[in-house]
A protein has these predicted regions:
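N-terminal, positively charged/glycine-rich alpha-helical extensions of SAM-dependent methyltransferases
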Residues: 1-34
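Class I SAM-dependent methyltransferase Rossmann-like catalytic core
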Residues: 32-46
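A short SAM/SAH-binding and catalytic strip from SAM-dependent methyltransferases
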Residues: 116, 127-141
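Conserved beta-strand signature within the Rossmann-like core of class I S-adenosyl-L-methionine
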Residues: 155-164
Length: 218
């Protein structure tokens, strides 16, 4: 394992200890400057590419897209490769990550927001909502996702990535079943994907898979 891979892994381990919104802000304050160069490059973090491709390939997007937990703009960058004219707004809890996104000029608007707070400042009228990495570390649960889904207008399409273990152990699977059975969402599709394109066994990465959920709000 290279030194840069080890540094990236040390940072990744820290992410799974995040509990409060302040924990997240402090963590990404230190992570933001080299998130792309170390974490993405050295660990082969391809999750944003997978999520963006599913959005573009599975849905017809005829309006603005909301990128929840936009970070440094990795998902938006991949969407723009296939849909250069896409209009994307980004939402993230970390002002430091948002600043890097802003410099890339990928987004129409960028909003600093804690998803556990009121969502009044978040627009409701989006063609699609996409997220890769927000529901990963366990601090945001299925009830937060349910509240987020309810915020957006009927007809909104969703591509939401969730940590594989947490999907099954922290109530997401049951939540989606309930949402589907009560006709709050429809056209539900589950995709199990790899988060990294490198050998997770050699890198000793936990949680190397994710469940990407595609659905529409009725």
């Amino acid at each position: 394992m290279s030194k840069t891979e080890k540094n990236a892994l040390d940072l990744l381990k820290g992410a799974y200890n995040l509990i409060t919104p302040d924990d997240n802000k402090k963590y990404y304050e230190g992570f933001a400057p080299f998130y792309d160069s170390v974490f993405v490059k050295d660990l082969g973090y391809t999750y944003p590419t997978v999520v963006a491709n599913l959005l573009v390939e599975k849905f017809t997007i005829d309006g603005p897209i909301c990128d929840i937990g936009c970070g440094t703009g990795l998902v938006a960058n991949e969407i723009k490769k296939k849909a250069p004219n896409a209009v994307i707004d980004g939402v993230d809890i970390s002002q430091d990550m948002i600043q890097i996104s802003r410099e890339k000029k990928l987004y129409r608007n960028l909003l600093e927001l804690n998803l556990e707070d009121h969502l009044d400042s978040l627009l409701q009228d989006y063609s699609a909502v996409v997220s890769a990495g927000t529901f990963t570390h366990g601090h945001l649960g299925s009830e937060t996702l349910k509240r987020l889904i309810s915020h957006f207008n009927s007809g909104t399409k969703f591509v939401i990535g969730i940590n594989f273990d947490h999907y099954h152990s922290k109530g997401f699977e049951k939540q989606f079943k309930a949402l589907n059975e009560t006709n709050i969402i429809d056209c539900f599709e589950l995709n199990e994907v790899k988060v990294y394109n490198k050998d997770n066994k050699n890198l000793n990465i936990k949680n190397g898979k994710a469940c990407v959920c595609l659905f529409s709000k009725t």
